[in-house]
A protein has these predicted regions:
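Soluble catalytic regions of membrane-associated enzymes that act on cell-envelope
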Residues: 1-173
């Protein structure tokens, strides 16, 4: 088993971005920055979070749940605590855990679900100071990723490993 310094883990959930638009996945070269990050770090090209809505992808990535015809687990009242998530696992191993979103995290019960299931901190729309652009789903991806980078740099200064789930929404619908 690995005995070195713990690696940081960042998962970027890019709303409505399919492989056909992502260069490193064999699609059109429309994502040069994502393509560059894929070359510098670990990028998984056989990961698929199924679902008919964004919240289904979120629950699949964080919990491993497969989609069901019922309401999303994130939205259910009794799922707001005690579900095992990747954040729980990493938190038990000394990681800082964080959800970063450009919109309002109370939407679809995300705030309650994440804080009750392993995420220690949430950054959402109210935490952005003078964003360059705010649309109907929240701040722009540029604002979101600048803030995410600031958070990563702060965690690095603290010398603690971190897990951050970054969820974009600016190209929703």
């Amino acid at each position: 088993s690995y005995q070195g310094k713990p690696k940081n883990l960042v998962i970027i959930l890019q709303e409505s971005l399919g492989a056909r638009f992502t260069g490193y996945l064999g699609g059109l070269p429309l994502t040069p920055n994502i393509d560059a990050l894929a070359q510098e770090g670990w990028a998984f090209n056989r990961l698929y979070a199924t679902g008919t809505r964004s919240v289904r992808g979120i629950e699949a990535v964080t919990t491993g749940f497969t989609p069901t015809p019922a309401r999303s687990v994130v939205k259910l009242g009794k799922s707001q605590t005690d579900f095992f998530t990747i954040a729980d696992l990493l938190k038990m191993n000394g990681y800082q855990t964080q959800f970063i979103y450009g919109g309002e995290s109370h939407f679809d019960n995300m705030r309650s679900f994440f804080l009750g299931n392993g995420f220690s901190d949430i950054v959402d729309q109210k935490d952005y100071i003078d964003p360059a652009f705010v649309g109907s789903w929240g701040v722009s991806d540029e604002d979101l990723l600048k803030r995410a980078n600031d958070e990563f740099e702060q965690f690095h200064k603290e010398g603690k490993p971190f897990f951050s789930l970054v969820f974009s929404s600016s190209n929703h619908e």
